[in-house]
UniProtKB/Swiss-Prot annotation:
GO terms for cellular component: extracellular region. The modification Arginine amide is found at R10. Keywords: Amidation, Neuropeptide, Secreted. The keyword Secreted applies. It is found in: Secreted. This is Tachykinin-related peptide 3. One of its GO terms (biological process) is neuropeptide signaling pathway. Expressed in the antennal lobe (at protein level). It comes from the Eukaryota.
Length: 10
């Protein structure tokens, strides 16, 4: 996912 935002935590 994106490097920032909710999916950036992965």
């Amino acid at each position: 996912g994106p490097s920032s935002g909710f999916f950036g935590t992965r």
